[in-house]
């Protein structure tokens, strides 16, 4: 009972201090160090647990085979907990990028035996995203303000890719809500990528249920124009 009484005030206090930091690198570094999103399996949050990533892991294996994917950029990669064991084929080149430099260095050590794995520090709101057959942007946009989200999308669309996997809390038909709530980057709110300010085309290749703890969320596969 004491944990329940004190946990939420502490959590709110920590978040308030994190979001006051001016630079995104500082905010996300603090989130990582304090394990603010973490659960028992992953510092990247509950969406990266094996339980909550089951559907996307199954789907990603099929996507790699069906769409003949030979290279992947995972932006952001976090600690790679959900994706680390998908690539049995070492011919698939995997690049994980993230804004937390300490986590990138840790990943380089953790996955050094995987010769097809590489990692790079990037602020996705400032840097062009490395090109690949498939770019995965899982659980990112809903942590970015509208302003930073637009910066990220500008960089994303400057990259070359054949396919893009993107998170949305709406499939464009069911629960087709408008994006009205803005946040400070590092916080969270639900997003619908088919509505302003994102305006993704509803003509997508594949819809994958990527529910987190039973809450509606999707990964949506788009083909490059």
Language-model segments: what does each one mean?
Residues 2-130, 144-225:
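Class I (Rossmann-like) S-adenosyl-L-methionine-dependent methyltransferase catalytic domain
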């Amino acid at each position: 009972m004491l944990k329940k009484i004190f946990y939420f005030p502490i959590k709110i206090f920590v978040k308030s201090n994190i979001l006051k930091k001016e630079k995104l690198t500082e905010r996300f570094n603090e989130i990582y160090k304090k394990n603010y999103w973490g659960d028992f399996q992953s510092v990247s949050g509950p969406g990266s647990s094996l339980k909550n990533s089951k559907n996307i892991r199954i789907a990603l294996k099929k996507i790699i085979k069906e769409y003949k994917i030979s290279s992947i950029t995972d932006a952001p990669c976090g600690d790679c907990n959900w994706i680390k064991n998908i690539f049995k084929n070492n011919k698939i080149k995997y690049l994980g990028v993230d804004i937390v430099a300490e986590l990138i260095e840790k990943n380089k050590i953790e996955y050094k035996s995987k010769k097809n794995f590489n990692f790079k520090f990037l602020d996705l709101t400032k840097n062009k995203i490395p090109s690949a057959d498939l770019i995965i942007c899982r659980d990112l946009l809903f942590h970015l303000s509208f302003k930073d989200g637009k910066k990220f999308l500008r960089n994303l669309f400057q990259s070359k890719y054949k396919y893009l996997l993107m998170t949305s809390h709406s499939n464009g038909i069911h629960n087709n809500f408008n994006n009205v709530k803005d946040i400070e980057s590092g916080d969270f709110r639900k997003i619908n990528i088919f509505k302003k300010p994102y305006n993704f085309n509803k003509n997508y290749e594949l819809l994958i249920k990527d529910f987190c703890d039973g809450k509606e969320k999707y990964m949506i596969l788009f083909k490059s124009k």
